[in-house]
A protein has these predicted regions:
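Short strand-turn-strand beta-turns centered on an Asx-Gly dipeptide
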Residues: 75-81
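Short acidic/polar inter-strand loop motif in beta-rich domains
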Residues: 122-132
Length: 142
């Protein structure tokens, strides 16, 4: 039975390879990035104190931006505002890669001024998710 099961599993793996139907996911659609962003909400933003300032990073969201239409960020209860996303680089092997010309995935604020951050994302299928976190990235008031 073990040999039959092993042979069956090997055939399931080999068939797409032999027919050329196995392709790597590019993570360029909402369907592909939603599951990832759903389980990585704690990483959506990061606040870092550096050089006498708070730096608010959205690097994680930029890394999955090809499945997004928009991100909005609100600081300390302010209405969320649109943060531009760099383009999806469909001509590259890693379309979500952050290239030198894409700009910085952060903004500067006065030191210790960020207490809470509201993050809203809109996927390319027009669905959305939101999250409010404290400066440590821990969810609050959702």
């Amino acid at each position: 039975v073990k040999q039959i099961t092993t042979a069956f599993c090997a055939a399931l793996v080999a068939a797409p390879l032999l027919t050329g139907t196995l392709q790597a996911a590019q993570f360029t659609t909402a369907a592909e990035v939603k599951p990832i962003l759903a389980v990585t909400k704690a990483n959506w933003i990061s606040v870092r104190e550096f050089n006498g300032q708070d730096l608010l990073y959205v690097t994680h969201l930029w890394a999955w931006r090809c499945g997004l239409n928009e991100i909005r960020i609100g600081i300390n209860g302010a209405d969320p505002e649109v943060w531009p996303l760099p383009p999806c680089h469909l001509d590259q092997a890693a379309p979500n890669g952050i290239l030198e010309g894409d700009g910085d995935p952060y903004r500067r604020y006065p030191l210790k001024s960020i207490e809470s951050v509201r993050i809203e994302i809109v996927y390319d299928d027009q669905t959305g998710e939101s999250l409010t976190v404290n400066r440590l990235g821990q969810p609050i008031g959702n």
